[in-house]
Amino acid sequence: MARGLVTMGGNQQFFDQNGYQVKGKIARAKDGQLRYFDKDSGNAAANRFAQGDNPSDWYYFGADGVAVTGLQKLGQQTLYFDQDGKQVKGKIVTLADKSIRYFDANSGEMAVSKFAEGSKNEWYYFDQAGKAVTGLQKIGQQTLYFDQDGKQVKGKVVTLADKSIRYFDANSGEMAVGKFAEGAKNEWYYFD
């Protein structure tokens, strides 16, 4: 009786501990890898998405039939899959290279050249490469500031790298020019 991952007729198939063939499900073999087995043939699927037991969990299985992880370019989309192979949607993620990325809540596509809101009402801006920007940035007609974690600064006085002191509006985050603003300790500044 077959058990585990077996190759039959050039196709990988999976049999549970009782010897029953797994079909239409994701299974983890002894090698620790996740694979999806087609609901009709039972063959390991390749180059396709499959839904997990939880309806919100999606996986993508590469050419080798194994669930992909990390940043992946699939067609015209750049997507991210966590260490368990689940597609990440609607979240801010810090990658191994320390870059901060956001993946759309509906499509899972990486945000590029746009703002996205984090889980605690903080705002980020993602550049053309999909990385959260930091420091002083000119975006459209506005000059904005983002902290070292990529979060937009609003309603605060900030000392920039050049030692200049700037204030960023509490609503828009735009740098104050030609106006007074109150600091955190009731001190007033004029920004020209």
Model regions and ranges:
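Extracellular adhesion/carbohydrate-binding repeat motifs centered on closely spaced tryptophans
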Residues: 1-192
